[in-house]
Amino acid sequence: SSSLTFNAGFTTAYWYRGAFQNDSSISFGADYESGNFYLGTWVADVGESQFDDPSLEIDIYTGFGFDLLGVPSYLGVMGYYYTDNFDRDYEEVAFGMDFGVASFDSVIYGDYKAGSGSASSDYGHFKLNVPLTDSFYGGSLGYSWQTFTGGSIHYATHELDYSTPALGGDIGIVIGHNNDGGAGATKNSDQDTTYATLSIGYTF
């Protein structure tokens, strides 16, 4: 069987892997699934570039789900591309497993497309997800720990996330903290920072 779904959302602040991206962001996406195969794209507003133009993040991803020793797993590739020189492009190979009581997502190989004569930089990422409860004030509560390593950037992030159905969609709250090596949209900003976001998303 196959399916095609679309999604739209808004968040009061856009943080990804413990790094600040934008004060607020509107996003749209589409996902196609057929058996164990998946393919999707996601587009988000990431604010102004160095040339003061509206900039977009455009993600494209594909992969396969499978069982590894009886554990649901996936292997995929993903690219992050930006308009108006907001950032250089990222391309990565990802692998993850879901054990029920915990799951993990990892970037087993990442390539940052540096420009202007600079060498490209390899990077890695690991995220551990632990569901805490699915009955917290009508929603689900979870914890995650993640780390990112690439070039001169090395940092870890802790996050608590809550989600619940509301207003015809899903409301999400994230409270996180990154360590001293955290990086933001501006060099050396948003390090050792506690942050919170409120989001709403719809799937149709």
Predicted regions and their residues:
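Outer-membrane beta-barrel proteins
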Residues: S1-F204
